[in-house]
């Protein structure tokens, strides 16, 4: 629950603590996604999903991601559900296919990213109303 600060302010504090302090060569910037500074309240992070190469391209990523969205909606009723997506995947439209409805280039701003962090991520997110709309769409399409 981020009632006292925004997602962007939280990143400025926590990303530095988690990634820069143990990796002194890393340098966190302060030009994070603009929308992150307006996100407050109950916020759920949707992490990475990795599929074996032979399981890709069959709609499984979309189905599993949407299932995660719906479970989070039912369990936590978040104000926002967000993820960080590689720029090339965001520009290919992967986020819209799985259910994200809002996109902002440059999620977190790294001047020098730690080795295991992508420096080109986009903030992708949905509001609670977006998630409710996604649930209605899934139900309507499932009944056809």
What residues fall within each predicted segment?
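Acyl-donor binding region in acyl/amide transferases
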Residues: 7-108, 114
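Conserved beta-strand in the GNAT
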Residues: 1
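Charge-rich, low-complexity intrinsically disordered segments
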Residues: 89-144
């Amino acid at each position: 629950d981020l009632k006292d600060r925004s997602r962007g302010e939280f990143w400025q504090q926590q990303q530095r603590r988690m990634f820069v302090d143990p990796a002194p060569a890393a340098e966190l910037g302060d030009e994070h996604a603009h929308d992150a500074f307006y996100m407050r309240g109950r916020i759920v992070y949707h992490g990475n999903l990795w599929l074996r190469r032979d399981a890709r391209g069959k709609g499984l990523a979309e189905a599993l991601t949407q299932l995660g969205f719906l479970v989070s909606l039912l369990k936590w009723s978040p104000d926002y559900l967000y993820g960080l997506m590689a720029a090339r995947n965001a520009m290919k439209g992967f986020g819209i296919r799985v259910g994200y409805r809002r996109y902002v280039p440059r999620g977190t701003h790294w001047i020098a990213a730690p080795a295991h962090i992508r420096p080109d991520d986009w903030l992708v997110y949905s509001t609670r109303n977006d998630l409710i709309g996604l649930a209605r769409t899934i139900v309507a399409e499932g009944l056809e």
